[in-house]
Amino acid sequence: MTKTVSTSKKPRKQHSPEFRSEALKLAERIGVTAAARELSLYESQLYNWRSKQQNQQTSSERELEMSTEIARLKRQLAERDEELAILQKAATYFAKRLK
């Protein structure tokens, strides 16, 4: 759950990702102030954890949008390549007929 990291001043606790996730769920249900009091945390910790979680979700959404856009552009490029190949064959055919 938590482990203590020694520093010269005061030992710091590092909370596991599972603990952070559960703390954020609790904060959603009962509010940040009450959750912080119940879990013996600072409110700012919960706010920081929440903003980091939202940033991670936002970047995941961005990655999904980018991969969708990349797939669309690849399909479009393949269509253009096919059209170009057809036009080149037609140009070759008509060039031979004119001779």
From Swiss-Prot:
GO-annotated biological processes: DNA transposition
Positions of the UniProt region annotated as Disordered: 1-21
Record-linked InterPro entries: Homeodomain-like_sf, RD_transcriptional_regulator, Transposase_8
GO terms, molecular function: DNA binding; transposase activity
Keywords noted in UniProt: DNA recombination, DNA-binding, Plasmid, Transposable element, Transposition
Chain's role: Involved in the transposition of the insertion sequence IS3.
Family membership: Belongs to the transposase 8 family.
Name this polypeptide is given: Transposase InsE for insertion sequence IS3
Name of the gene this protein is made from: insE
